[in-house]
Amino acid sequence: MFSLMRSKQKITFIVFGGLSFLSGCQPVENPQVNLIPQPAQMEITGGYLKLDSGEVFSDSPSSKLESVVDPSWKGGNPEAYELRVTSKGISLKAATEQGLYYGKQTLRQLYTPNGFPCVAIQDSARFPYRGLHLDVSRHFFPKEEVFKLLDVMAYYKMNRLHFHLTDAGGWRVESKKYPKLTTDAAYRTNSDWLEWWDGQERQFTTADDPKAYGGFYTQDEIREIVAYAADRHITVLPEIEFPGHAFEVFFAYPELSCSGKAGVDHDFCIGNPATFTFMEEILSEMIDLFPSEYIHIGGDEAAKSSWKKCPKCQALMRKEGLKNVDELQSYMIHRVEEFLLSKGRKLIGWDEILEGGLAPEATVMSWRGESGGIKSARMGHDVIMTPGEYLYFDFYQADPRTQPYAIGGY
């Protein structure tokens, strides 16, 4: 999914538009210039600069690209740049290396077999959060595939990879504290997610099983991915699911569920103190691996049914004066946020974290439409709008009979 972020109390969806300004070279032809995203200001001045791409994108002193980093330009806006292609050459100016990088991505998109169309561009990002969500639990992708995705994101100036590392389909990141998460819950018995889940197979196996599907990233591989992304000015935000979507965890550590059995529960037992020990130790490992300001903790689609009959959860509710299971979930989210804040990080959760009371500093990712995001913004919280109807990639794009397997499966 794509995701867009605005600051407190204001939510806006991207609308691309251009404004004409300064002329750069005399019109000879009328080139078609298609850029994604469209720059804030652009004038197509006509004609082409006849250069081979190698003359521009090489790092050699003979490169025809004149680039300048001026920290005072545009007030130091880190993402802004100015690009001019004229009959005499190409100039690129920015306040930071990040802005320079984005200008080069625009230049890459401009190149055609005829050369570079003559343009004058001034550009800066409208949205500070330009994200893509990758679910590697239901469908595992090795690090090389993640690298390819990061390259595509960089090409379109996207700056956040939302890395969905844990879910019922498998646990995908190495933990030194809880090694059974990857020995016992990273490989399932069917590569087809829908067959495995909807068909009630729902079993995990070990890596040496011939029918095993899955895998995980070692901590060193995570560091490689984070570094590769950083080189492209992309921040990787890990998502570790609490308190729901934890079906796989209980195949490794069943004592963290209300039933104490594998394959029964989907939610952590909030009344069990060991749950909070697990949470803090796992998040501490993620904080060491991911330097991102934000950590995504899920918070969506908790079944909550096991909490209603769990003696430990009911005892905690009585102790804390919680009226219902929605407030019990909110209690957990508040504790997660307090822990993250103590480590200098901030919490993002799906819009279900509104239920039972929103944690004070939480950022809400609104996926069940727009209303959760609007409500959160009115409460003074930052919001990332990700309404599934518009932004999920796994919907059918046409008649399902003509399309590949969609909505979670292949």
Summary of predicted features, one role per range:
Residues 137, 166-170, 241-245, 300-302, ...:
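Active-site beta-loop-alpha junctions enriched in small/polar residues
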